[in-house]
Amino acid sequence: SPICSFYGVCGGCSMQHFRGSSQLAYKQRAFEETLQHVGKVRPETILSPIEGPQHSYRHKARFRVKFVKKKNKVLIGFNEKKSHFLTDMNMCAVVPKKISILLEPLQLLFNTLSIKDKIPQIEYASNQKRHIMVVRILEELSDVDIKSLKLFQDFHKIEFWTQTKGYDTIKPLVNEMDTEIIYSNIEFDLHFFFQPTSFTQINPFINLVLIRRAMALLQPKKDELI
């Protein structure tokens, strides 16, 4: 059975009715068929697929935000399946639990803002320690709005950033915040800096396994740099 109670209505996921192993088998078959029909190649050997957790794995996503006048309520989430309507959801099983449990409190918070009908989206990015939410705003926040956002982020240990136009307008709500996020792989002593809107692998658990697999296949010598 699906791990999310909104599966079937929400368009964010499409394969939760399959077991994890069945999803992998389906995707592998589709990949092999693409290689044969489009690439005109057939691999001699196919490694076993890399597996990761089935829930709370998506450390980067973009939520739509919409104030619905008829409900007098701000909705935050993904579109309904094959629809422009926004799913009325209070949790999401594929994002980190920290983000999932904040969906409903965020809706209540945004409903109090003076520009609640001028916020089209939130883009979030998480690493091992920080949870950043980039709030797209079409009008300036009032002083009261800023105070409310600061109180919320301090209490819930997240960081609000704002975006007024393009990506070059993104900035932390509090100027003292570090504007770069660190992704670390302790096993291989790797540390990368990135921005909340940078393109990254949304599943950090898969990253770890991918690097282990690549290193095992390459078998680099001590004097070789990868």
Language model: regions and residue ranges:
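Accessory RNA-recognition modules of RNA-modification enzymes
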Residues: S1-I226
